[in-house]
Amino acid sequence: MASIIREAEDGFDAFWQEGPRRGKLGSQTTRFQAPQLMWHDLTAKGFARILTVVYAVPIRRGECRLFARFPFQFQSAAPKLLIGLRPRWLQHIGNHKVLEDDQVFLHWQERVLERAGGSPAADRTFFMPNKADVYVAALHRWLNSNGGEPFAGELLPERQRNEDLMDRFQSHTKSCRSCSTALKRIRAARPWAWAVLWGAAALVGLGQGGPWTAVGFAAAALAGLTLRQVSRWEKGLMRGDGAAPRNQLA
C-alpha cells in the first residue's frame, strides 16, 4: 500500500513500494505540488522511466481543465520507435478511457460531499479502503489545512446526464489538432469505403464464380472491416461509452 511520507503547506510526497501492476513496473513515487500539479514517477527495470504528470485548472464550480503529459525515458531504442509509430490521436482515445474511468462516479460523489459539508466532512462521508485512497485523503487534509476554495460560495451546477459526461468532441477533439484532423480524414474515408464495398458487390455478381468473384469477396471483406474500424474510431473521438475498463471482465 502507498504511504504518505511528507505533508506540508506546499503539498505532499508519497511512496508505493510494490508499485502498480502488482510490482511489475517497480516502486512508484508521487508528488503533489500544491495547489494543482501532481505526478507519479516510476522506473520499470529494463524498459523505461515513466511519468504521469497532471496539471488541473479549475475553470468553474465542479469542472477542471486537465493538462496531462506522459513522458518516457526509454532504456533502449526499440520501445521508443514502436510507441512513436502510434498516431497521437489514438493515444488520446486511450487517455480518454483512463480519465473516464471515474468520471460518472466523481460527478455524483462531489454532490454527495457538498451536501455533507464539503471537504471537512470527507473523513465522515467516504469509506476509502483502497491503495489510491491515501492520495485522496492527503489532498483533503491539505485543502482543509492550507488550501483555499475556488468559486467559494457557489453551488455545484445541476447533475449532468451520463451522455454529456462522456462527451469527447466538445471537451477535447475540436480543440486538438491531431484528433480534429483525424476525425476529418475518417469521415472523408467513409464514402470511399462504401464505394469499394458496392464495387466489390458488383464484381461478385458479374464474376459468375470466376477469379473476379474471389477478388470481389476479398474487396468486400476489406471494405467492411474498414467501415467497421472507422466507425469505432469516429465514436472514440466523439464520445465514450461510460464502461469503466477496470469493471470489465478479463
Task: Go through the PLM ranges and name each one.
Residues 1-250:
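C-terminal catalytic domain of Rieske-type non-heme iron oxygenases
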